[in-house]
Amino acid sequence: MAEELAGVRSGVVVSPHSDLSVDVLVLRISQQHNSSRRIDPRLSDGASEEISLVAAQAPQALPVSDVHFGGGTPTIIKPEDFLALMDLLRRSFAFRKTATIAVEIEPRTFTAEMAEALGAAEVSHVSLGVQSFDPIVQKATNRVQRKAQTTAAIENLRRIGISRINFDLMYGLPHQTVQSCVQSATAAVAMRPDRLAVFGYAHVPSYRKNQRLIDETALPDIAARAEQAVAVAETYLPNGAGAVAVLASLPLAAKSQPVL
């Protein structure tokens, strides 16, 4: 990494509003109807090293208006490691007083202790990966997530003062129907998120090995996917039920997302 960053100093452009993105990579072991995660403690050390290297190459402390923890499952690292990363970021860059700090959350592994860490780090926005509340769909995607886990995550977040909560749902998942999509969106809206985003599922088993466990015959076709997206939009947009963003897409379009 040091070699890759060598010579960057002369090319660093200090923008009036810089963004930072921190990706936490997670080794995930997927099995039929089950998944477990093993976290290498060196992950946070590697992120810290890269932060220090980038900061050292800048001609001056870069001003920061937005920080996003994503790309993996950032809240699965230890709370103390997250706080250490945030402390390093604040010491390495010039955070604006109005800086937005956003974190992606995995509800199944999110703890009250991690919520406390997010509050201490002054996190302002969170995004919860939900995908679907339908147990049949969850089983088909090997991602069983009880509604109680999502509810507990929201309660922990609101308890420590984080109210800007986004839900990520999906359509186009195996065994999904128009009815199950609308029911999942209804359940999500009932939890009062600040924003609801509905993405199209992208089935790319050649890229995502865990998707090879999915029964392709259970995937809705393009017409069915379109019906699902339209149904969610028509159900909520006319009623003004919060800010709902339905990102319609074909299976391999840029706005589609693979199952996490």
Swiss-Prot record:
UniProt keyword list: Oxidoreductase, Plasmid
Record-level GO BP terms: protoporphyrinogen IX biosynthetic process
InterPro entries linked: Coproporphyrinogen-III_oxidase, Elp3/MiaA/NifB-like_rSAM, rSAM, rSAM_horseshoe
A GO cellular-component term linked to this record: cytoplasm
Enzyme Commission identifier(s): 1.3.-.-
GO MF term list: 4 iron, 4 sulfur cluster binding; coproporphyrinogen dehydrogenase activity
Ranges of residues in domain Radical SAM core: 6-239
Designated name of the protein: Uncharacterized protein y4hJ
